[in-house]
Design a protein with these regions (language model features):
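A structural motif
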Residues: 81-110
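Short coil/turn linker and secondary-structure boundary residues
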Residues: 62, 99-102, 125
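Activation targets extended, charge/polar-rich intrinsically disordered C-terminal tails
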Residues: 104-194
Length: 194
Protein backbone atom coordinates (compact mmCIF):
# COMPACT_ATOMS: atom_id res chain seq x y z
CA UNK A 1 0.00 0.00 0.00
CA UNK A 2 2.23 2.77 -1.25
CA UNK A 3 0.22 5.95 -0.91
CA UNK A 4 1.98 9.25 -1.41
CA UNK A 5 0.83 11.24 1.62
CA UNK A 6 2.14 14.38 -0.06
CA UNK A 7 0.20 13.60 -3.22
CA UNK A 8 -3.51 13.44 -3.73
CA UNK A 9 -5.53 11.34 -1.32
CA UNK A 10 -8.23 11.69 1.30
CA UNK A 11 -8.49 10.21 4.77
CA UNK A 12 -11.75 8.96 6.25
CA UNK A 13 -11.67 9.33 10.05
CA UNK A 14 -13.46 6.90 12.36
CA UNK A 15 -14.26 7.32 16.04
CA UNK A 16 -15.65 4.39 18.02
CA UNK A 17 -17.19 1.02 17.31
CA UNK A 18 -19.69 0.52 20.11
CA UNK A 19 -21.77 3.25 21.73
CA UNK A 20 -20.43 6.64 20.68
CA UNK A 21 -19.42 6.67 17.02
CA UNK A 22 -18.47 9.37 14.57
CA UNK A 23 -17.03 9.87 11.08
CA UNK A 24 -15.29 12.82 9.43
CA UNK A 25 -12.85 13.34 6.57
CA UNK A 26 -9.54 15.03 5.79
CA UNK A 27 -9.29 16.54 2.29
CA UNK A 28 -6.25 18.16 0.73
CA UNK A 29 -6.54 21.77 -0.38
CA UNK A 30 -4.82 23.35 -3.41
CA UNK A 31 -1.64 23.87 -1.37
CA UNK A 32 -1.49 20.14 -0.54
CA UNK A 33 -2.40 20.70 3.12
CA UNK A 34 -4.97 18.50 4.83
CA UNK A 35 -8.13 20.13 6.20
CA UNK A 36 -10.76 18.72 8.56
CA UNK A 37 -14.40 18.42 7.43
CA UNK A 38 -17.20 17.33 9.74
CA UNK A 39 -21.00 17.49 9.80
CA UNK A 40 -21.69 17.56 13.52
CA UNK A 41 -25.38 17.00 14.00
CA UNK A 42 -27.71 19.32 15.80
CA UNK A 43 -26.76 18.87 19.46
CA UNK A 44 -30.28 18.00 20.58
CA UNK A 45 -31.37 17.50 24.17
CA UNK A 46 -32.14 13.80 24.70
CA UNK A 47 -32.51 11.85 27.94
CA UNK A 48 -31.15 14.58 30.18
CA UNK A 49 -28.13 15.57 28.09
CA UNK A 50 -27.17 17.20 24.81
CA UNK A 51 -26.05 14.78 22.12
CA UNK A 52 -25.41 14.80 18.40
CA UNK A 53 -22.19 16.76 18.21
CA UNK A 54 -21.63 20.48 17.98
CA UNK A 55 -24.24 23.02 17.02
CA UNK A 56 -22.17 23.88 13.91
CA UNK A 57 -20.24 22.06 11.20
CA UNK A 58 -16.46 22.09 10.85
CA UNK A 59 -15.60 23.00 7.26
CA UNK A 60 -11.98 23.19 6.03
CA UNK A 61 -10.57 23.54 9.55
CA UNK A 62 -6.80 23.81 9.95
CA UNK A 63 -3.94 22.97 7.63
CA UNK A 64 -1.98 19.84 8.42
CA UNK A 65 1.06 18.51 6.55
CA UNK A 66 -0.23 14.93 6.70
CA UNK A 67 -3.08 12.86 8.13
CA UNK A 68 -0.64 11.63 10.77
CA UNK A 69 0.07 15.21 11.82
CA UNK A 70 -3.68 15.76 12.18
CA UNK A 71 -4.13 12.61 14.30
CA UNK A 72 -1.29 13.66 16.61
CA UNK A 73 -2.31 17.34 16.79
CA UNK A 74 -3.77 19.07 19.85
CA UNK A 75 -6.80 19.92 17.68
CA UNK A 76 -7.66 16.20 17.46
CA UNK A 77 -8.76 15.94 21.08
CA UNK A 78 -11.80 14.77 23.00
CA UNK A 79 -13.62 17.46 24.94
CA UNK A 80 -16.48 19.94 25.16
CA UNK A 81 -18.47 20.44 21.97
CA UNK A 82 -18.29 24.24 22.26
CA UNK A 83 -14.46 24.28 22.46
CA UNK A 84 -13.33 25.65 19.08
CA UNK A 85 -9.69 24.71 19.73
CA UNK A 86 -10.46 20.97 19.40
CA UNK A 87 -12.61 18.72 17.21
CA UNK A 88 -14.20 17.17 20.37
CA UNK A 89 -13.69 13.55 19.20
CA UNK A 90 -10.02 12.64 19.36
CA UNK A 91 -9.94 10.26 16.40
CA UNK A 92 -7.49 7.39 16.79
CA UNK A 93 -7.66 5.97 13.26
CA UNK A 94 -8.19 6.86 9.65
CA UNK A 95 -8.18 5.21 6.25
CA UNK A 96 -6.25 6.91 3.43
CA UNK A 97 -7.57 6.42 -0.09
CA UNK A 98 -5.63 7.60 -3.15
CA UNK A 99 -7.52 10.21 -5.18
CA UNK A 100 -6.81 12.69 -7.94
CA UNK A 101 -6.87 16.45 -7.47
CA UNK A 102 -10.14 16.49 -9.42
CA UNK A 103 -11.66 13.94 -7.04
CA UNK A 104 -10.46 15.99 -4.05
CA UNK A 105 -12.22 19.04 -5.50
CA UNK A 106 -15.45 17.09 -6.08
CA UNK A 107 -15.36 15.59 -2.57
CA UNK A 108 -14.73 19.00 -0.99
CA UNK A 109 -17.41 20.79 -3.04
CA UNK A 110 -19.99 18.05 -2.41
CA UNK A 111 -19.28 17.99 1.33
CA UNK A 112 -19.60 21.78 1.57
CA UNK A 113 -22.81 21.80 -0.49
CA UNK A 114 -24.47 19.09 1.61
CA UNK A 115 -23.40 20.72 4.88
CA UNK A 116 -24.82 24.09 3.82
CA UNK A 117 -27.96 23.02 1.98
CA UNK A 118 -29.29 19.89 3.69
CA UNK A 119 -30.63 19.62 7.22
CA UNK A 120 -29.09 17.12 9.60
CA UNK A 121 -31.10 13.92 9.85
CA UNK A 122 -29.87 11.01 11.96
CA UNK A 123 -31.00 8.39 9.43
CA UNK A 124 -30.58 10.19 6.13
CA UNK A 125 -28.02 12.95 6.44
CA UNK A 126 -25.56 12.38 9.28
CA UNK A 127 -21.78 12.48 9.74
CA UNK A 128 -21.39 9.10 8.04
CA UNK A 129 -23.73 9.60 5.08
CA UNK A 130 -22.29 13.02 4.20
CA UNK A 131 -18.78 11.52 3.99
CA UNK A 132 -20.13 8.66 1.87
CA UNK A 133 -22.13 10.89 -0.49
CA UNK A 134 -19.09 13.13 -0.97
CA UNK A 135 -16.86 10.17 -1.84
CA UNK A 136 -19.52 8.67 -4.13
CA UNK A 137 -19.80 11.96 -6.05
CA UNK A 138 -16.11 11.51 -6.94
CA UNK A 139 -16.62 7.91 -8.06
CA UNK A 140 -15.37 6.22 -4.88
CA UNK A 141 -17.47 3.21 -3.90
CA UNK A 142 -18.52 3.33 -0.24
CA UNK A 143 -20.78 0.28 0.04
CA UNK A 144 -21.93 -2.69 -2.02
CA UNK A 145 -25.45 -2.23 -3.28
CA UNK A 146 -27.27 -5.55 -3.48
CA UNK A 147 -30.80 -6.44 -4.43
CA UNK A 148 -32.47 -9.64 -3.36
CA UNK A 149 -35.75 -10.98 -4.63
CA UNK A 150 -38.16 -12.76 -2.33
CA UNK A 151 -41.21 -14.68 -3.46
CA UNK A 152 -44.10 -13.98 -1.15
CA UNK A 153 -46.50 -16.95 -1.23
CA UNK A 154 -50.15 -16.48 -1.92
CA UNK A 155 -52.69 -16.35 0.83
CA UNK A 156 -56.01 -17.53 -0.53
CA UNK A 157 -57.56 -16.93 2.89
CA UNK A 158 -56.77 -13.21 2.52
CA UNK A 159 -57.52 -13.21 -1.19
CA UNK A 160 -53.94 -12.40 -2.21
CA UNK A 161 -51.93 -13.96 -4.99
CA UNK A 162 -48.19 -14.56 -4.72
CA UNK A 163 -45.80 -11.78 -5.70
CA UNK A 164 -42.09 -11.00 -5.83
CA UNK A 165 -40.64 -8.37 -3.50
CA UNK A 166 -37.24 -6.86 -4.28
CA UNK A 167 -35.27 -5.54 -1.34
CA UNK A 168 -32.18 -3.39 -1.92
CA UNK A 169 -29.45 -2.63 0.57
CA UNK A 170 -29.03 1.02 1.42
CA UNK A 171 -26.13 3.21 2.43
CA UNK A 172 -25.03 2.40 6.00
CA UNK A 173 -25.82 5.14 8.51
CA UNK A 174 -23.76 3.82 11.44
CA UNK A 175 -20.22 5.27 11.23
CA UNK A 176 -18.27 2.12 12.12
CA UNK A 177 -20.30 0.06 9.63
CA UNK A 178 -19.71 2.70 6.96
CA UNK A 179 -15.99 2.81 7.79
CA UNK A 180 -15.62 -0.96 7.37
CA UNK A 181 -17.61 -0.84 4.10
CA UNK A 182 -15.37 1.93 2.74
CA UNK A 183 -12.26 -0.11 3.60
CA UNK A 184 -13.73 -3.26 2.02
CA UNK A 185 -14.61 -1.44 -1.21
CA UNK A 186 -11.27 0.41 -1.45
CA UNK A 187 -8.53 -2.15 -0.73
CA UNK A 188 -5.89 0.13 -2.26
CA UNK A 189 -6.07 2.32 0.86
CA UNK A 190 -3.99 2.33 4.02
CA UNK A 191 -4.91 2.43 7.72
CA UNK A 192 -3.22 5.04 9.90
CA UNK A 193 -3.33 5.30 13.69
CA UNK A 194 -2.58 7.85 16.36
Amino acid sequence: NNIDVNGDSITVLNYGYIRKQYMAILIQNDAGEWQYFSVNGDNVYVSGEFSGGRKFNDIAVGEFDSPQEFLNSPYNSYGASDDMSINTYGFSEGYMIPTSKEQDDIIRDTFISISKNESYDFLGNNCSTVVQKSLEAAGIITFTQKSTRHRIPSSHYLGESSFIATISTSRPVIPSVSFRAIIKNNPQGKMIYR
